[in-house]
Every structure is written in structure tokens, then in C-alpha cells.
């Protein structure tokens, strides 16, 4: 192993991530009481141009008036992208007026590490001037070919500028690639396998190398729960920590898939016990149920046990 190890920047439980349009305040209370681990109030794609200013006011009110953290939620706001004239006001107005209640900001269409730096610099100034006692984190959407081409640099340099998590924005990524698909997160039957696997894997490796949380993005057809679960299983198998829910019906599906089964947790604990006993006897490896286990097995087992502990409120994952 290299002598350089990048520890996780910030650990949060993020199995399910509920998207809530900032222009629909009637949905805020429902999101607060939902089973989602993470909620983001959206000022970007879910809000029509004529509604942007009103949506921003709605989001500020929701952050000020509702106790998101007290209801077990990580609360975030997706601002508009840097190439729009909305982004500056999104950051300044939301953070100055309600930043004390905000956990993270979700930056869409991140293309380079400098995009993260720009947002971080704005947050530094606002937090200092307002005297905030906590630091707001940054999460980015990788949803363009430029962002995917620079994903390693974004993770590497972004971690020094508040970056906590990356999300795979499959819809805009598909458009950027000119992929032949019209269902958000859906698969083209002419492609053998999962056409998003390469992008997901590339982003995942960058995240894990530099201690950033990898989060899978949306699946558009909320009337097709089985396909949603299939996509979530693929992400979980790769090592993602959670998936978006663009409809409340998808929350429990994400929670189910990204919660390790009891049998998996039990087996992981058995691995750790067996290796602990082997270590006491001076052995680096052991056998469990007819299979060899070693230090690598312990690391995989610890990941499962830590996730289970976080879900049950014992420790942070």
C-alpha cells in the first residue's frame, strides 16, 4: 500500500437521497417526515426559469422553519450551475439567510476542479462574514463528459475545498455523450449490459481514492420499481453508498438495497471474530466455512459492519 492514504473527508449516511423541487413548498413537510437519509431542495432542473426567484425564497423559508437535522435528515440545496446567472444569487441569498441550517450545497454540472474552488471561495467569505460555527460541505454532480474526463482532479483537489461527495447525473451525462436513450437511468436494449457501468466505475474509483462519497443518481421511471432496484443493486455491488429518489416511492427501495442484509452483517462479524482469533494464535489468515479469509477479508467485513452500525445509529459509517 502507498504511504499516501486519503481518509474520508466526511462520513454521512446517504442510502436514499430525495429530490424536492424548490417551487413546491407543499412537498417540504412530507420530505421532512419521509424515510430519506438525505434531502436536497432543488433550485435547478426541477424549477422553471420564471419560478427561480420564488423557489429560492421557498428554500430559505424551509431551511429556517423546519428542523431537518432534528428529524434525522442531512439537508442540502442544489443550486444552479456556474454557467447560469442564477448561481451567484442562489449561493449568496441562501447561505447568508439560512446557511446555519444547511449541511451541504450540491453543485450541478461540475466540469473542473476550479468549479469547486469557486463555490468554496464564496462559502469561505460568507461563513466568515456571518460568523457561522460550522462549515458547509460541497457535493458535485458529474453529469458531463468534461466532468467525467476530469473526475480524478475534481476528487483530488476538491477534497481540499470542502468536497464531500460526487453524484452520477445520468440524464445530462447521457445527453453529453449523445447516448441513445430517453429514459433517465434506463438501459438501451441494443447495448450488451449496463451502458452506464464505465462512467459509474470511473467516478467510483476517483471517489474512493480520495475519500469522497460516491452516490448514484436518478432513475426516471418511478412506475417501474423493479428496474429501479436492479439499477440500485448494480450501484451497491460496485461500492456506491446510495441512490437518488425522485419520487417518494423510491425512498424505501433505495434504503432496502443499500442496507446490508442481516445474513451479510452476520457473516462479516464472523469473519472479524475468526481473524481476531487467528491473530491471537500468530496467524494472518484463517478458514471460515471452508474458505480462506485474510486481512483483505477483514477490510471488506469492516465496511459492512460499519454501514450497519451507522444505520442503527451506533457510529457514523
Predicted feature residues:
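Expand to "…catalyze enediolate/carbanion chemistry for C-C bond making/breaking, isomerization
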Residues: 1-317
